[in-house]
């Protein structure tokens, strides 16, 4: 994937940050493969919300900056950092797909109104 990815990892877990980084890169490459031309930059933040305590404490937030200047932010909180990355990447894919569908719908609407104006003239 040619899109630059910035990582901010704040974790008290025993998992190696490089392992998390590699996993996140792979998941994001999969989630963004169809939309890579529209992405400018990705920022991934991983952290433990509870510190060393147990419970749901692994948070992954992903910010995607699009080439048109818009930003898409998603977040996932689970008990396991790999699951947080996977869920956040899935949510990013869904949010990006919805964003692009909105753009396509508005372009179709503009074309239709332009065509209607020509027909009425």
Q: Residue spans of the language-model regions?
A:
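N-terminal, polar/charged subdomain of small-to-medium soluble alpha/beta proteins
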Residues: 1-121
């Amino acid at each position: 994937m040619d899109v630059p990815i910035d990582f901010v990892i704040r974790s008290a877990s025993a998992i190696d940050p490089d392992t998390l980084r590699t996993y996140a890169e792979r998941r994001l490459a999969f989630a963004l493969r169809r939309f890579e031309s529209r992405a400018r930059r990705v920022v991934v933040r991983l952290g433990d919300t509870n510190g060393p305590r147990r419970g749901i404490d692994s948070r992954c937030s992903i910010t995607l900056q699009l080439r048109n200047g818009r930003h898409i932010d998603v977040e996932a909180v689970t008990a396991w950092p790999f699951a947080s990355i996977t869920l956040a990447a899935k949510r990013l894919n869904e949010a990006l797909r919805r964003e692009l569908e909105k753009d396509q719908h508005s372009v179709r609407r503009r074309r239709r109104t332009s065509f209607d104006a020509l027909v009425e003239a």
